[in-house]
Every structure is written in structure tokens, then in C-alpha cells.
């Protein structure tokens, strides 16, 4: 920042989640520095907040090895062009939002040119490919981390890191309105309710749906009034789930929902879900849960050798103990899943204790992340 020009922040977001984070950061920065300039690779939300887009975010939003290889030349061209143009612009700070495979190399290129760099959202280096931490340390002046154990990991390697809390924890109330969610979904207040969330990826839905449905059938024997809600992320996953249900449990009555995962979690007494961000969201919804996950045997064998954590779900990683039951591979079968869910549906001591711990963990990571991120950017820009 100089007397001649406004504070200039360069940003690169590579997918929708990054666009949401970028928009929140820009909004918080504009409140403090109204004339700041924002430029880079932006999605519609960031652009709506005033970010000048040199490239559209969709240019970077490619998934899968085949898709990346098909777009590799274009991606390398964009990264080289951004290195050149940001180098000429000399922004006060560069913020790479997630998209580590693209952004960390770009951050390193810019840092060599004397530009201060932030990586916003830590990759899962604490879980696997831990040696990436050294590349991140060379490429960035600061990592912004959502979770406290991420900061503890970076501290071990003397990589500057700031824990800012999680934006999802800011967005969700500490005490959700369960009856309000049931009103929205048409679930009676006095019914037992189970949410099934078999994942957002096709492979997960294919691998988990049958066992999740069989588990629900077993639970219906104990709770004949059991309402079962199944939020599905899009029409393709819904069609896939309906096909599996027709084969496995054609007579099982369920509420299929288009999206509405958060409402389903808040409304339910318990959830059975695949691991991932859904487990964190379920914790923040204060819905007791069991995590069930299965992958192809070779993939699991490889993952066991690569992954360096004791748990797979974020609630357990945050708690530092097995707060929620994780049933993986051969353990992920209807009898064991149902046995783990029964005490949660009973709404007794087990689920109340889990609820209380969920609330404590929510408070720990509810830190107004947008404001914290903006403060970190401004401090680095000085």
C-alpha cells in the first residue's frame, strides 16, 4: 500500500467453496478499507463484492486426473500469466484460497518476487503427504487455518500459521431450532428421526447406500415410527440412490430431499453419514452421529499407510478422542451400524453427552473467521 494507490489485494479462488470464502474476506476488508482494490481469479460471489476477475473461477475448477490432464496446458498458461501480471502489479498481499495444487506453486513464484503471500485453508497435510508442509513454508508468509489442530501441526514445523476459526461454525447457530427444521421437512415433533447421508460423490453413494438402507430397516424394527430423511446433493445422486433403494429396500418409506442436508441434520435425532465435511456440519447441527465408510480394498490399504491420523472424522480429530463411532470397511455393515445408532435414537445419556461436547467444540471454532482473515491480511500488508 502506498500513498499513490489503494490497498491492493490479489486473490485466486478455484472452486465454489473458495468463492464463498473470498467474498466473505473481501466484505470484511472493505468494511475496514473501503477503497481497497481486489483483483485475480474470482467466482460470481467475489465479483459481486467488487473483485476484478482476470480469469473466471471455472477455468480452474477441474476435478479428476483425466480432466486435469486435458486442461493442463491451459492451467499452466494461466499460472504463468498470473505470475507475470501479479509480479508487475505488485499487490500488497496475495491470497491463494484453497486449490493448493494450483496456488502453492503460484504463491512460491510470487514470494520470490517479494510479494507477501497467504494460503487460506490449510490442505490436509496433517493427515497425509506431510512433507508438503516444507513446500508450503517456502511458498507462503502465512497459512490461515480453520481448525486448532492444524495450527498445532504447522507450529511443529515453524511454519507461520494463524487459527481463524471455521466459517461454517460462524454461520450455524449454537442452539439449532429442531422443531423449526421439522416443520420445514414435515416431520412430527414426537417422531424418532434418522438422517442418512451416503456422501456427495457417485462412488460413495454406490458403496454405502445399500448398507445404510439395510441399517434403517433394522432400526425400524425397534422404532416403527422412525422417520428417515435422505438429503441428496443433486439430481444425479438422487437417481442413483433411488435405483439402489429399489433393489435393496423397495418397501422402506423415506423422505428424499433435494439438498437440504443441514435441515435434515438439525431435524434428526441421529445421523448415519460418510466422513468428510458432512461430519463437521452434523456436529455443528448438534445431531448425534455414526460415521460409516467403505472404499475399495486396495484404496483402503493404501490410505492406511498414507494417513497419519488416528481418526477419519473431524469431530473426533477436534475432540482428540473417539467422540463419534467410526465404522470402516468390514465394520461398516448393517448390524454394527444399527447397534451404534440405537442408543443415539433413544435420546438418553449417550446422545446428551455427545450434544454437549458438540456445543463446546462449536464454541472453540466459532471465531468470526472472515474478520480474523481480514485482520491477518491487513497485518501482513503493513
UniProtKB/Swiss-Prot annotation:
Belongs to the LpxB family. One of its GO terms (molecular function) is phospholipid binding. Pathway: Glycolipid biosynthesis; lipid IV(A) biosynthesis; lipid IV(A) from (3R)-3-hydroxytetradecanoyl-[acyl-carrier-protein] and UDP-N-acetyl-alpha-D-glucosamine: step 5/6. It is an enzyme of class 2 (transferase). GO terms for biological process: lipid A biosynthetic process. One of its GO terms (cellular component) is membrane. Keywords: Glycosyltransferase, Lipid A biosynthesis, Lipid biosynthesis, Lipid metabolism, Transferase. Pfam families: LpxB (PF02684). Transmembrane segments: none annotated. Condensation of UDP-2,3-diacylglucosamine and 2,3-diacylglucosamine-1-phosphate to form lipid A disaccharide, a precursor of lipid A, a phosphorylated glycolipid that anchors the lipopolysaccharide to the outer membrane of the cell. It comes from the Bacteria. It catalyses: 2-N,3-O-bis[(3R)-3-hydroxytetradecanoyl]-alpha-D-glucosaminyl 1-phosphate + UDP-2-N,3-O-bis[(3R)-3-hydroxytetradecanoyl]-alpha-D-glucosamine = lipid A disaccharide (E. coli) + UDP + H(+); a lipid X + a UDP-2-N,3-O-bis[(3R)-3-hydroxyacyl]-alpha-D-glucosamine = a lipid A disaccharide + UDP + H(+). Its EC number is 2.4.1.182. InterPro entries: Glyco_trans_19 (IPR003835). CDD domains: Glycosyltransferase_GTB-type. This is Lipid-A-disaccharide synthase. PANTHER family: LIPID-A-DISACCHARIDE SYNTHASE, LIPID-A-DISACCHARIDE SYNTHASE, MITOCHONDRIAL-RELATED.
Amino acid at each position: 500500500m502506498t500513498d499513490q494507490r489503494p490497498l491492493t489485494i490479489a486473490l485466486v479462488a478455484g472452486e465454489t467453496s473458495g468463492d464463498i470464502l473470498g467474498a466473505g474476506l473481501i466484505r470484511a476488508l472493505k468494511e475496514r478499507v473501503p477503497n481497497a482494490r481486489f483483483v485475480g481469479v474470482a467466482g460470481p460471489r467475489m465479483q459481486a463484492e467488487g473483485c476484478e476477475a482476470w480469469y473466471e473461477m471455472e477455468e480452474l475448477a477441474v476435478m479428476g486426473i483425466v480432466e486435469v490432464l486435458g486442461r493442463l496446458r491451459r492451467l499452466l498458461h494461466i499460472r504463468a500469466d498470473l505470475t507475470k501480471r501479479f509480479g508487475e502489479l505488485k499487490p500488497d498481499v496475495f491470497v491463494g484460497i484453497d486449490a493448493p495444487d494450483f496456488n502453492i506453486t503460484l504463491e512460491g513464484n510470487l514470494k520470490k518476487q517479494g510479494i507477501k503471500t497467504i494460503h487460506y485453508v490449510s490442505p490436509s497435510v496433517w493427515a497425509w503427504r506431510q512433507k508438503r508442509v516444507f513446500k508450503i513454508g517456502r511458498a507462503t508468509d502465512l497459512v490461515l487455518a480453520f481448525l486448532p489442530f492444524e495450527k498445532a501441526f504447522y507450529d511443529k514445523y515453524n511454519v507461520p500459521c494463524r487459527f481463524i476459526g471455521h466459517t461454517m461454525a460462524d454461520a450455524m447457530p449454537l442452539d439449532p431450532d429442531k422443531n423449526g427444521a421439522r416443520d420445514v421437512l414435515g416431520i412430527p415433533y414426537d417422531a424418532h428421526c434418522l438422517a442418512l447421508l451416503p456422501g456427495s460423490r457417485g462412488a460413495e453413494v454406490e458403496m454405502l447406500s445399500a448398507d445404510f438402507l439395510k441399517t434403517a430397516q433394522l432400526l425400524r424394527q425397534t422404532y416403527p415410527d422412525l422417520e428417515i430423511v435422505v438429503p441428496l446433493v443433486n439430481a444425479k445422486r438422487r437417481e442413483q440412490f433411488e435405483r439402489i433403494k429399489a433393489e435393496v429396500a423397495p418397501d422402506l418409506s423415506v423422505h428424499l430431499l433435494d439438498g437440504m442436508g443441514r435441515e435434515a441434520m438439525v431435524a434428526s435425532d441421529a445421523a448415519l453419514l460418510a466422513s468428510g465435511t458432512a461430519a463437521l456440519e452434523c456436529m455443528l447441527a448438534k445431531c448425534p452421529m455414526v460415521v460409516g465408510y467403505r472404499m475399495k480394498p486396495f484404496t483402503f490399504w493404501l490410505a492406511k499407510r498414507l494417513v497419519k491420523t488416528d481418526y477419519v472424522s473431524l469431530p473426533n480429530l477436534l475432540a482428540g478422542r473417539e467422540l463419534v463411532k467410526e465404522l470402516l470397511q468390514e465394520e461398516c455393515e448393517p448390524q454394527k451400524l444399527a447397534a451404534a445408532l440405537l442408543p443415539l435414537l433413544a435420546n438418553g445419556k449417550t446422545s446428551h453427552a455427545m450434544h454437549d461436547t458438540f456445543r463446546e467444540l462449536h464454541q472453540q471454532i466459532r471465531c468470526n473467521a472472515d474478520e480474523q482473515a481480514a485482520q491477518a491480511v491487513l497485518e501482513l500488508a503493513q
